[in-house]
Amino acid sequence: MKRFIPMGCVLALALSLAACAGSRDEITQEFLPDTGPTTTSVSTTITTSSTPITAPVDPIAEIGELASRVAEIRELPLDLPPIETRSAQEVLDGYQALTGLSLTGDDRFDAEFLQMVGVLEDDGAVADLLSVCSIPGYYDPATGTLVLREGLIELTPLGQKNLFEELTAAATDTAHDWWGTMQSLSAAGDADAAAALSGLVRGDAVFHAGQYVESQLTPTDRFAITLEQISCDQQRSNPPGYVAELEAFGPEIGRAFVEDLISTGGVSAVDAAYRTPPQSTEQIYHPARYPADRPVAVDPQALTVTGFTEVGAGVFGELQLRALLSDGILSSQALQAASGWGGDSYRLLWDGTDLVLVLRYEGDEARDARELAETLGGWASASMNVGSGRPDNTGLAFEGQEYAFVAHNEVAMLLVLSSDARAGRDIRDEFWPDW
């Protein structure tokens, strides 16, 4: 079946771009209109300099100066990517399409999954979960272009920081082709490794943008960034814990991973990580486990039940487990349960009406499988439309309008979630009597 870049992968890569953009004089002012051409290709020779950026009349020249700073601070050559300008709404739409919450590439199945796990209201749309402020632009790795907002006159300090991140992503993509690697991982069904790579990319960009802010911007500009971020946060709705976990993965967890690499081997260690990418989001959360602690391959069990179509499959990973457990239970309990991840495989099945998730998991130790099973049982009771758990062979079944089954055996664990109790039982019975 056709694979798609999954939920959490591109999202972790780019959601830190969400920010307000305006003029230097007034933080909340919209960019003034411009009558310039809508598409511009620019090739800039990069030189290094320690002098502060002056305020050029041409915003393209200002962005070219940012590219020079990227080459200097990130220590990678960079020609300014071809520039495409779009309307403000088109920029937001394109950005949200790039950062969309997708497991399957189909809005219907994605919405069904998020509704089933209690993230999205029954009548809600996936796009409702993504809330971003006005942005100056973003790097589109699929086309290798820098997409800018029409009428861009000048960049605010936060706009400079944001585009520095995007240009850093462009530089690392040019040097290491992380987008091609990410597509290959996704096509192979390894959603978790693709998400791990996106955490490296965004963490790299955010870390070096922080270096730029500290070394190149004035205290006044740094204070303006804080004010802009506060203004943006006030405009955005608070996301569910599931989305918040994905949002934080690149800017916070990925940045910490990059900082760990730099502390031991400098920027050369970061470049080496692109050549030997992290194999799991577990390695991003726990840098000491990179690169030796490789994930365990878990084969999905063949199913003989008829009437179901597979609409998604791959590796779920620690990131998705943390996101799933981010609401409904204590955060400390969720952290403990997700941290023993050793490997897994998941399948999303559709019978024409309802969706079923099957997750087979292997922990580092037997206690990891037990802790996760117990935690998932509590989470299902709190987050899904199910009743109290009842014994069911080796595990517990939770039934109501929806369905959950969870069991563990030594280091292994099985989880079945369904938006319909009958469909859930049909899939759960496929694992009888072993589970």
Please report, for each region that a protein language model flagged, where it lies by residue:
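Extracellular mucin-like PTS domains
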Residues: 29-54
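Pan-zinc metallopeptidase signature
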Residues: 68-69, 238-353
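Short pre-active-site segment immediately N-terminal to the catalytic Zn-binding motif
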Residues: 146-164, 193-196
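Auxiliary, metal-adjacent structural segments of Zn-dependent hydrolase domains
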Residues: 61-156
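C-terminal motif of bacterial Sec signal peptides marking the signal peptidase cleavage site
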Residues: 16-19
